[in-house]
Swiss-Prot record:
Signal peptide residue numbers: none
Subunit organization: Homodecamer; pentamer of dimers.
Binding site for 3-methyl-2-oxobutanoate: 43-44, 82, 112
Role of this protein: Catalyzes the reversible reaction in which hydroxymethyl group from 5,10-methylenetetrahydrofolate is transferred onto alpha-ketoisovalerate to form ketopantoate.
Catalytic activity: 3-methyl-2-oxobutanoate + (6R)-5,10-methylene-5,6,7,8-tetrahydrofolate + H2O = 2-dehydropantoate + (6S)-5,6,7,8-tetrahydrofolate
Entry EC number(s): 2.1.2.11
Designated name of the protein: 3-methyl-2-oxobutanoate hydroxymethyltransferase
Length: 272
């Protein structure tokens, strides 16, 4: 399992960091088997595996449930679990209680929290021993206000993002996720920080990349963002399901190959 210091060492050696967002035991098991460096249990699970319309409906209980499953599937991978909407920003005491609960009950290596406004929370969480990954740029919990669009696209917005990135590092963040920002801006931020910067839709100038398991494997998704490359096609599973349906209806399944050979009814009938 990678440690924070090893991830920082990878950045210093210019070794790119791979990260995949996964939500359950089997996907986490596959991600670990593939040798991926980090797993993110993102609150995007609300739309991807729970069928919610947005991340707004995702609860702390949801994140704990899925975080535990991922940890069981990937016991030797650096796992980061999202703080869902409403878990940060109420009061510092409550925020830290939520963070501690999520961190302890999932056995994660770090938690992730969105936005530039959470630097005081990062400081306090770090002080009590909870590693925090920050998330700037497009933050899914704020799309109701920001919309799904490129962030940092003006001079003022870019300058603010650079400042925000420096602030979250100074507050104690162990890594930073940058989402949907210009490539050159992401590269500039990565150069100026000592912590690893993981990009999603932020070009190749970051220290690593993250994609969602279901997006990159075309597994049950209808719409994919511009920055998503499909590396395999799990949608072919539908063909297998159709064949199963046909074989059940025709009686072709189960054949003898898939049937236990022991006969018992003669013994039952002889006892009558």
């Amino acid at each position: 399992m990678k440690t924070v210091s090893q991830l920082i060492d990878m950045k210093q050696k210019e070794t790119k960091i791979s990260m995949v967002t996964a939500y359950d035991f089997p996907s986490a098991k596959q991600v670990e088997a593939a040798g991926i460096d980090m797993i993110l249990v993102g609150d995007s699970l609300g739309m991807t595996v729970l069928g919610y319309e947005s991340t707004v409906q995702v609860t702390l209980a949801d994140m704990i449930h899925h975080g535990r499953a991922v940890r069981r599937g990937a016991p030797n991978t650096f796992v980061v679990v999202d703080m869902p909407i409403g878990a940060v920003g109420i009061s510092m005491t409550q925020d830290l209680n939520h963070a501690l609960k999520l961190y302890q009950e999932t056995n994660a290596n770090a938690i992730k929290a969105e936005g530039a406004h959470i630097t005081p929370f990062i400081e306090k969480a770090t002080a009590i021993g909870i590693p925090v990954v920050a998330h700037l740029g497009l933050t899914p919990q704020s799309v109701g206000v920001m919309g799904y669009k490129l962030q940092g696209a003006t001079k003022e917005a870019a300058e603010q993002l650079i400042l925000d990135a420096k602030n979250v590092e100074q507050a104690g963040a162990v890594a930073l996720v940058l989402e949907a920002i210009p490539n050159d801006l992401a590269e500039e931020i990565s150069k100026h920080l000592t912590i690893p910067v993981i990009g999603i839709g932020a070009g190749k100038g970051t220290d690593g990349q993250v994609l969602v398991y279901h997006d990159m494997l075309n597994y049950g998704v209808e719409h994919k963002a511009k920055f998503v490359k499909q590396f395999a096609d799990f949608s072919v599973g539908v063909d297998g399901l159709k064949q199963y349906d046909q074989e059940v209806k025709s009686g072709a399944f189960p054949s003898e190959e898939y049937t236990y050979k022991k006969k018992i009814m003669n013994e039952v009938n002889n006892n009558d």
